[in-house]
């Protein structure tokens, strides 16, 4: 056995799930103490799959009913994982405009690592209810926010349109509102799902396009307390070091956070550091018995 899957689980993700059992010709790869994968402590990050050089471990989405790989990509797109703010870089392998599988790419935030969401959480992109073209409300259709429109009723209330028509319609409507009361009738509220570049363009649209400073972002509310604490303690409300810097730290303090659940790739660096001798202190008013607390000294 090459043991790459064991090393990926232990040394990269620090999950310590995959190991070797028995001796001699009976030696084999096991999960925990020879438990079935589904009953083990495996978090399905897929690091072992990416590390496997032979195809002994492979994504189920590539196999047919007989367990034979029949799907091969026709192109690969370099992008970022959309699930959280860690910024993991990915290679998305595509065939006929359908995602086949995702691999971690060597970037400063993840060093080719991914979590279960980043590697396997892409089925929403092909959900039959996903809107694929712009829709415009049909003339005369009543507007009622209390009415829940099912997928089968969408064409009753909306019609398909081109991007040009939809953008022109939206721009005209926003312009009419802005012209009625310039500077005060329009406000922009940004989303945490947007990248920094998208957030910059959004505020630029509000400030320059509609000539108003009525722009805000949801993270100002949820991170106001942490920013204030950072300003007082470090004289900076922004991040001062990447997660990977944990590898060089002697002591790491995690306060009120659950990185193993919410930012699993970031948590790998904390777990790596703890296994290499760093002091990991976890403070959480909700309490933690699993996750990052398993690796904490206090």
PLM regions and their residue ranges:
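N-terminal export/assembly segments and adjacent metallocofactor-ligating motifs
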Residues: 1-298
């Amino acid at each position: 056995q090459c043991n790459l899957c064991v090393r990926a689980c232990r040394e990269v993700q620090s999950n310590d799930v995959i190991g070797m059992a028995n001796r001699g010709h009976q030696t084999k790869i096991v999960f925990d103490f020879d438990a079935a994968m589904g009953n083990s402590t495996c978090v399905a990050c897929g690091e072992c799959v990416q590390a496997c050089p032979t195809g002994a471990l492979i994504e189920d989405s590539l196999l047919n009913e007989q367990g034979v790989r029949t799907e091969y990509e026709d192109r690969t797109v370099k992008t970022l994982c959309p699930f959280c703010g860690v910024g993991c870089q990915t290679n998305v392998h595509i065939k006929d405009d359908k995602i086949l599988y995702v691999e971690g790419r060597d970037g400063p935030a993840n060093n080719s690592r991914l979590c279960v969401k980043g590697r396997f959480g892409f089925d929403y992109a092909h959900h039959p209810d996903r809107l694929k073209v712009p829709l415009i409300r049909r003339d005369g259709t009543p507007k009622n926010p209390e009415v829940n429109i099912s997928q089968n009723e969408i064409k009753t209330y909306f019609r398909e349109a081109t991007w040009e028509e939809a953008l022109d319609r939206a721009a005209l409507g926003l312009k009419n509102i802005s012209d009625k009361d310039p500077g005060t009738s329009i406000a922009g509220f940004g989303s945490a799902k947007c990248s920094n570049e998208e957030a910059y363009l959004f505020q630029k649209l509000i400030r320059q396009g509609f000539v108003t400073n009525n722009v805000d972002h949801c993270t100002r509310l949820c991170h106001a307390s942490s920013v204030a604490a950072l300003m007082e303690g470090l004289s900076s409300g922004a991040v001062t070091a990447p997660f990977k810097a944990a590898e060089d730290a002697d002591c790491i303090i995690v306060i009120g956070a659950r990185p193993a659940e919410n930012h699993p790739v970031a948590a790998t660096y904390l777990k790596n550091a703890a296994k290499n001798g760093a002091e990991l202190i976890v403070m959480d008013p909700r309490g933690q018995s699993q996750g990052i607390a398993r690796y904490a000294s206090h």
